[in-house]
Amino acid sequence: MSGFSAAWLALREPADVAARSTQVTATVLSSLVGRTPLRGVDLGSGTGSNIRYLSPRLPTCDWRLVDNDAALLDVARHALGDLNPRATSINIETRVADLQTLDSTVLDGCALVTASALLDLVSESWLARLVRLARDAGAHVLMALNYDGRIVCSPPERDDDLVRDLVNRHQVTNKGFGSALGPKAGVRAEALLRDAGYDVCRAPSDWVLGAEHAELQRQVIEGWAHAATELAPDLSPRIQSWTERRIAHLSAGTSHLVVGHDDVGGILTARG
């Protein structure tokens, strides 16, 4: 994990920051204030965008960033070097690891397990194992930007629903962790955390993309078209026509996309 380029991660980061649920974040982080030592583990870290968001809000926390892409972690390490100039004792550790196997040692000594835009890619069994490991470590959980299946395109176009439905079918195919949770990720995370003894909060964290996100919109639209065509190659002409119409709206400065996500937080109140 991660399988995404540094350029893509940089492009989406402002939309991610704007989308996140401040309520879910504040609820989880406030439960950790005063806890020492305090270490967070971020899974599928990429270039460290999740830590750029969280560290100023939890300035006494050390971080372990975990990804299978050493090049992205190198970008993260350099970008995060002076993240908290007031907190000179903050330690940023990076670890190259295969998240598919989710070695329990990755969570050693952690009080918080985080990830961003990860859970919709993983399987139910993988998520259940993560919840068990987090509980056994005594760690709270904060999982941001889980895709939930909602796509609203404006102005509306013929075949918006067709493409959305194909995208959502594609979302549950194997992304390297077994059959992916896709749009069910947030709901299943909420249920599994609650069953494991966590107090859980979940709230929308939708991408709202306007003219200022033109390049992000373009890449999202083209990505949807690619996924839809993979599942329904016989519908390729319709999907291509839809793509051209959506890009025309984008070129005219009138395109607006809402892409549904949710954030899930878990505060551990019982040890099983």
Say what each PLM segment does.
Residues 1-35, 47:
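Class I SAM-dependent methyltransferase Rossmann-like catalytic core
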Residues 44:
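Conserved S-adenosyl-L-methionine
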Residues 48-52:
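Glycine-rich SAM-binding Motif I of class I
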Residues 54-101:
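Class I SAM-dependent methyltransferase SAM/SAH-binding core
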Residues 114:
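A conserved beta-strand element that flanks and buttresses the S-adenosyl-L-methionine
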Residues 121-134:
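A short, conserved alpha-helix within the catalytic core of class I
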Residues 139-204:
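Conserved catalytic/acceptor-binding region of the Class I
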Residues 201-252:
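C-terminal helical/coil "lid" or tail adjacent to the Rossmann-like core of SAM-dependent
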